[in-house]
C-alpha cells in the first residue's frame, strides 16, 4: 500500500509475490510482483441513484487525474481532435504538477463521507470510477468457503454479492472476452 511502498500509486492494497516483477505500460516505475488486489469496502450510507451518479462523476475525474499523474509519457486524445489533445496535455500537466498523492488523498476522502456502522450499503470507495452498492447485510459474520486448497472467509450472501458485480457469474464470458485487460507483463526474477 502507499504506507509501505513510497512509489506505490494506488489506494488499494496488494498482496505481492516478489519472486516475479511486474513491468507496466505507461505507469511510473515502482517495485511490484505478481499480485492480488485487495478492494476495501467502506460505508456508503443510504445512497440514492442520483447520489451514486454524482459520486461517480467525482471518481471519474479523480481517476483520470491519478492515472495522468503517474503515467510515464503523454498520449494524445483518442478522439482525433487537436483541441481535445491540447486540453488533455494541459490537464495532464496540472495532474503531474499536483502529483498522485494529492488526487489519491482526495479519493481517500470520499470513503469518509459515510459512517460504516450506520450505513445500509457498502461500496469500494477508493479506486475505480463506478460505485457498486452492496447491502451491508450480505456480509454478516461471513462464512468459510473452500478455494482450491485453502479456506477463505466470504460474505454470508455470496450469491448476491457476486451477482451485483458479475451478473451470471457461473457462466463463462464469450471466448473473445477472455483476455487480460491490464497493461503489464510479469517476469520471473533471477
Residue ranges and their predicted role:
Residues 52-63:
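Short, surface-exposed, charged loop/turn segments at secondary-structure junctions
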